[in-house]
Structures are given as C-alpha cells and as structure tokens.
Regions:
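Gly/Ser-rich "nucleophile elbow"/oxyanion-hole loop immediately N-terminal to the catalytic nucleophile
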Residues: 92-99, 171-190, 211
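Short beta-strand/loop motif that positions the catalytic acidic residue
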Residues: 334, 339-346
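C-terminal motif of bacterial Sec signal peptides marking the signal peptidase cleavage site
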Residues: 17-20
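C-terminal catalytic histidine-bearing segment of alpha/beta-hydrolase fold enzymes
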Residues: 312-315, 319-322, 326, 336, ...
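Alpha/beta-hydrolase active-site loop
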Residues: 155-178
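Accessory cap/linker subdomain of secreted extracellular hydrolases
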Residues: 222-331
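Short, surface-exposed "cap/lid" segments of acyl-processing enzymes
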Residues: 78-87, 91-135, 148
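Catalytic-loop region of hydrolases
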Residues: 5, 22-98
C-alpha cells in the first residue's frame, strides 16, 4: 500500500473516531441492531490497482473502478437473542454515483477468525472486491465469532447468519450516509458454500420485509448445504463427501451446535478418543485449516462414537432441532430472480442439496444452474463471474 493510501487511512481513522464511529457519549446508548460500533480503513485501490488485484486472483473485471474498503464492527444479536457485535467488510466503489446498488456476498467455511473477509481473508475479500470494481457497493459479513466478533463461531447456523448479514446492511447504509451516498433498497444477495446457506437465509429475511429499508432484488447461491438432515449429513457418512472434508464438516457443525442446542454433555459422548479431548480446542477460531485437519482422522467412522454416527443418520432431540432450524432456507417463495449454482462433481457439498432446494417452495421460482463435473472450490471460481454478469444485466450498479 503506497504512502498516499496510508495517509488517507490515518485521516479516516481520525475522522471516524471523532464522528459516527463513537466517542464517550456512545458508551451508554441502548443496543440498536446495525448500529456502528467502529470503522477502520482496510485498503484503498485505484482503478488500475483494482484491475491488477482481481487479475491476480482470477476474477477479472473490465474497466474496474477504484475501491475503498472499511472494516465495520456493528451491533447485532447472538443465537439466544442477546446483544452482541459482529464485523464485516464494506466496499465502496470510487465512482461519481451518489445512489448505489448493494451486493451482499457471504463467504465460505472459515475455521480461523482472522481469515474472515474484513481481517486477512484475501480469497473471500477478492470475491467481494469484484462487485465493487463493477460499480456496486458491496458487503461481506464475517458472521458471529469471526473477524472482530466475540465468542465462538456458530458454524452453519442459518438464523444468526441471516441476522448478522442483515444488520451489516444497516451498518453499511449508515456508513455510506456519512459519505453523502445512499443505497438502493433492492439488495443483490450471493454467497458460496456456507455462504450459500447464509445468502438464502438473508434473502428470505429481505423477501419477508424484516430488514428495515431493504428488500430483495435478486439472489444467486453457489454450492450450499441447504438440506443438512436429508442430504449433507447422510452424504458425509456414506462417502459422497470426501472423508477428511466430512470430518471437518461434522466436527465443526457438532461442536458449534452444541453451544446453542446442547447436543452433548461431554465431548466423549460424541467423539472417539483421542479426538474428544482436542476437538473443541481445534475449533476455537485460532487454528488454521491445516492444524484442524491434521488433528482429526480421515473418516467420520473414526471420529464419531457409534451413538453419534446413528444420531447423524437419524437425528432426534436437540440434534434434530439444530438441523431443522437451519434447513428452512429454501422454504419461501420469491417474486424476484433466484439462481442456484451447483456441480455434480462436488465432493464437499453434494449436488443433491440444490436439487432438494428446488423441490422446496423456493424451487417454484428458482433456476438451477448445473456447473458440471467440477469439485467444490472450482464452483465458486466458475459461478461468480457468471453471477456478476447476471447482476449487471438485470440489476445494474446504478
């Protein structure tokens, strides 16, 4: 980052500290969802710099705009409804347009909190930058417990993915207002993997009119586990999901859901030794993917106890509630365009998840785009440029 951008960043910090980002008078104010707690500059790029950056990440955008990025910490709610905070990335295109269309991009599975989009998550950051480079305002929620958010991350918990994403929209609107710009109320929503579930959860809230001042303009979700009980959990057990990926998914999901639904009293009820003694520590948000996977076995049958293998296949009680609470992201009807992108070659999130979504209420108006015989990571690289092109044709940035 050059000296000019560094000086601009320092000036932004000083201005924000004295203004909307909070002084002493803010400490005692009542909690308000979407209210800004703090703002910090992350980077600023000119048009040519943005173009070079996206070319390096293989998300090229023709005639890319300059982009300014902010890390926003804002007020939201925890899984039990109590006040908490979360962070997210807000990107503003360097254009003369005062009224901007907004894109919300929800990121994929992240085990380390500092790999969230507003922190050091360069891969997910680049995916968000492409929308701002095209002239949209863009946001990327970190979700609860990642980035600057306190506590542990409630992995794949659709209700809090939706609330954290929705409240970031409110924070972004306030930030843009301070810059004398406004957001069009129609939001374009997209996301990948875990973020596909989050995207549809947010889209449902926008369609239902529960996000003040915002509605849904279009949604495009890529390779999401929309049906944990009927598809994703069984596939993790029967080999459709590759072994280590299945272990990562089940270990992350079970430990996260235990904090909300209390699916076990002791890790030894769910996990075999020696993994029962270490698994909660591995998913503490401070271990990277290599550390997590190297500390766990290569198959669910080696990870889970017989009781929890049976529970994953035929859930009851708290496990069933945990699945059902997040398996509703396709149970709504849309009157705006919705696309689901998925691949038959995906060994992390089977294609059947999207097929199941198409059989739900959303399927009556959604379109399923088959990306072919490619694996999970390739789906987002293939789909996102298509999604940007679709957004630009149907809902131009300004």
């Amino acid at each position: 980052m050059n000296v000019r951008r560094a000086l601009l960043s320092m000036m932004s910090v000083l201005c924000l500290a004295a203004g909307a980002c909070g002084g002493a008078e803010d400490v005692a104010r009542p909690s308000s969802r979407g209210a800004i707690v703090s703002v910090a500059p992350v980077f600023e790029m000119t048009g040519p710099e943005t173009s070079d950056y996206l070319a390096e990440w293989k998300y090229p955008v023709a005639a890319a705009n300059g982009v300014r990025a902010h890390r926003v910490v804002y007020e939201t709610v925890a899984a039990d409804g109590t006040p908490t905070t979360a962070s997210g990335l807000v990107l503003v295109p360097d254009t003369a347009t005062e009224r901007l269309r907004l894109v919300s991009y929800a990121h994929g599975t992240t085990v380390r909190r500092d790999e969230a989009p507003s922190a050091d998550g360069e891969t997910e950051r680049a995916r968000t930058v492409q929308f701002a480079a095209a002239g949209y305002a863009a946001v990327a929620p970190d979700y609860l417990g990642l980035g600057e958010g306190p506590g542990a991350h409630p992995y794949a918990h659709a209700p809090t993915e939706a609330s954290a994403s929705a409240d970031l929209l409110l924070a972004a609107r306030a930030l843009l207002a301070d810059q004398h710009r406004e957001l069009d109320p129609g939001v374009l929503v997209t996301g990948f993997s875990q973020g596909a579930q989050a995207a549809l959860a947010l889209a449902r809230e926008l369609r239902g009119g529960t996000v003040p001042g915002f509605g849904l303009a279009a949604s495009a979700a890529v390779s999401g586990a929309y049906a944990v009980r009927e598809v994703q959990a069984p596939a993790a057990l029967d080999g459709r999901v590759e072994g280590r990926r299945a272990v990562l998914y089940l270990g992350y999901w079970i430990t996260a859901m235990n904090r909300i639904y209390h699916v076990y009293d002791d890790p030894a009820e769910a996990f075999q030794p020696p993994y029962a003694q270490r698994i909660e520590g591995l998913f503490d948000g401070y271990h990277d993917l290599l550390a997590v996977t190297s500390g766990l076995p290569n198959s669910p049958q080696k990870l889970l106890t017989p009781e929890f293998l049976a529970l994953a296949a035929n859930p009851t009680g708290a496990a069933l509630r945990a699945m059902d609470d997040s398996d509703t992201v396709c149970d709504w009807a849309s009157d705006v365009p919705v696309r689901l992108y998925a691949a038959r070659g995906d060994r992390s999130v089977p294609f059947e998840n999207s097929q199941r979504c198409m059989k739900a209420e959303l399927g009556g108006t959604a379109e399923l785009v088959d990306l072919g015989d490619i694996d999970h990571g390739d789906t987002v690289r293939t789909a996102l440029p298509q999604i940007l092109d679709w957004f630009r044709k149907t809902q131009p940035p300004a």
